[in-house]
């Protein structure tokens, strides 16, 4: 817990109603306290950091001027919402963020009436806010709806679908979009829109035009000279700011203004509250504002573990096991040296996907398409038609956004595209919106796909090489974090397609492990004298091995960190059914529900696919296996 007596104003704020009792002149001091509190809190707990620091003033202004929760705020992505959570009743719990049973890392409707829409993926806020505004209008509710979206999220096509719809509606929706322009997503924002916004925020000429207009106008508002000067200013502003883009889409554009200047923010928002129809306010902010180290390293301080704010992040020393992301990072550089046709695509996840070194060593073969997963996949398809070997490096949860393109543009045409899918399966503290629980199900049903799941780091490297060499679409799906610590070398060796690995020969029951569950399955199998197979391939399955094992075993147990519905285990059932083989089957995997935020270890245990859970499930189905346990385990289990 944090000593709130050091925050005399913030300690009096439990809800936005409390905030609105302060005089407007005190808002700057409140913002300073909120920023300091956030730094202290995230220093203790870890979590998303720099984005929240960048919207302190904006968060204070919005909750001060708008009658939340009657008026509704929709935050895009949600990385920036810790200040919002602090002001809306969760101040004393914010130190539990991302922890099991603690505060959710993103807005979550079940957690608070002030969290009006659940988010986690980018670029959804304008569509959701427009839907709310339309529903309110139809219900006769005179409420205001505000969407807060970053410039990084503005690179996604969904944003322009929503803007296009909102700007052409009759009657006009009561909608305000706030463009939080900090030139960043998680990595640096890229693309043509980013360049245009950058010209707006950094134009000395535009600032000079503004100041000149003020001097000419003085206190005059409506005389002919004033009207002429305003038209002249708007004409020149159109050359430097994106107002034309948004106004042609039907939005009234205001800005850009300094997002850290509370009086300017409050003044602009008060004016916008009096206007009808779709409005867009463009604010310029600095990610990490107020904490010098975060301002200087906005990527490194995007999300942090616990740290001492007086010292900043301290680099870890000593040897450490490579993560699966590290394995991919090394492999892709090695493969690029051996395969000149290799090209790599990422949707704005250079750091997260392990592509920093590749982007520097092979800048002409590296394509960051911004937050545009649909484009990323079809871009890869186009490259493949010309003989290139594209690799799409993407998180499992974000591949969901490019699924139609994977099916329609890649798989139907049987194009040579490799999907390097990070954060597959149980991810952990970021919760349901970032889980990779569905990918084996939605990949294995696609014709022509080869789907692989490595049991260790060395196998991951071999599978990536296999996917590049395969003629057709392939996916390697690997988990967050480290593996068991398998020895690695610089080899680019491949695996035979659809061949499993027998890990342990036993009797009675065969445990069929997929991906990250293999080690736990092997430990239990050796305890109980059972056969253990590292399946390696979710599609195609090793049909010959499975049919042979079916002749000599009394039952199969499939184990995967994917939802059971439609997953790898379902593939085994389908294979046996096609061969008219009837035998006891037990499918262990993730439940038919969205997992909450907690550590990866906690979630695996809850799902019953850690070592203890697998053992318990086996003994429940086949109690006679109890006699195979060592005495100590037998007593503990009994």
From Swiss-Prot:
Catalyzes the acyloin condensation reaction between C atoms 2 and 3 of pyruvate and glyceraldehyde 3-phosphate to yield 1-deoxy-D-xylulose-5-phosphate (DXP). Its EC number is 2.2.1.7. Belongs to the transketolase family. DXPS subfamily. Pathway: Metabolic intermediate biosynthesis; 1-deoxy-D-xylulose 5-phosphate biosynthesis; 1-deoxy-D-xylulose 5-phosphate from D-glyceraldehyde 3-phosphate and pyruvate: step 1/1. It comes from Xanthomonas axonopodis pv. citri (strain 306). GO terms for molecular function: 1-deoxy-D-xylulose-5-phosphate synthase activity; magnesium ion binding; thiamine pyrophosphate binding. One of its GO terms (cellular component) is cytosol. Keywords: Isoprene biosynthesis, Magnesium, Metal-binding, Thiamine biosynthesis, Thiamine pyrophosphate, Transferase. Thiamine diphosphate binds at residues 79, 120-122, 152-153, 182, 291, 373. This is 1-deoxy-D-xylulose-5-phosphate synthase. Pfam families: DXP_synthase_N, Transket_pyr, Transketolase_C. Signal peptide: none annotated. Binds 1 Mg(2+) ion per subunit. PROSITE patterns: TRANSKETOLASE_1, TRANSKETOLASE_2. It catalyses: D-glyceraldehyde 3-phosphate + pyruvate + H(+) = 1-deoxy-D-xylulose 5-phosphate + CO2. NCBIfam families: dxs, PRK05444.2-2. Homodimer. Mg(2+) binds at residues 151, 182. Its cofactor is Mg(2+); thiamine diphosphate. InterPro entries: Dxylulose-5-P_synthase, THDP-binding, Transketo_C/PFOR_II, Transketolase-like_Pyr-bd, Transketolase_BS, Transketolase_C, Transketolase_CS. GO terms for biological process: 1-deoxy-D-xylulose 5-phosphate biosynthetic process; isopentenyl diphosphate biosynthetic process, methylerythritol 4-phosphate pathway; terpenoid biosynthetic process; thiamine biosynthetic process.
